[in-house]
Amino acid sequence: MKLLHQVAAFNRAEDPVSGLLPDGATALFAGAAADPNCQSLSGLRRRLERKKEAGARFLQTQMVMKPDVLEHFCNEVANPLGLPVLAGVFLLKSARNASFINRVVPGACIPESLVVRLDEASDPMAEGISIAAEQVRSYLSLAQGVHLMAVKAEERIPEILNQAGISLVPV
């Protein structure tokens, strides 16, 4: 919350230490993290409402593995707050990777059907890329965007986007 207040102050050209920013106001676009798998969406909505009041202008979710969870989060939390959502898509590299995440990452909820799908795949990484691409396509109908988490496999992001039908624009 303090960081959101600080960004809002910078956007007003204010510096709590020295007064005014010497180069004028910034134009930072602050967001807030949200966990769509949270058990208490009403509590989450209250926390995110305070973050919005502090200056959050969008939400970026933790990894979400099921479209119905994202849809419920958007309908019950994000949409009533008027905050756009970037849905978190995580590249699962293998069944072992998915099981590990379920075991050690708080709030992670990778369905057993996806673990089995990865386990039965002849090429688990290719299957993980397909799963991520399916999620991107699905989530873009529910949220305003996605953010991809491809830990130690960032070079696979173009492949995910290509399979999802998203054209890359050269920079």
Protein language model features and the residues they cover:
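Conserved, mostly hydrophobic/aromatic
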Residues: 51, 55, 87, 146
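Active-site pocket-lining/capping segments in soluble small-molecule metabolic enzymes
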Residues: 1-23, 33-38, 78-131, 135, ...
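Substrate-binding cleft of secreted/luminal carbohydrate-active enzymes
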Residues: 133-140, 145-149, 154
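Active-site glycine-rich loop that binds ribose-phosphate moieties when present
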Residues: 15-19, 39-54
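Catalytic beta/alpha-barrel core
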Residues: 57-66, 147-150
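Structural motif
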Residues: 54, 80, 141-142
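Catalytic cores of alpha/beta
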Residues: 42-48, 71-75, 95-99, 138-139, ...
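C-terminal/domain-terminus segments
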Residues: 148-171
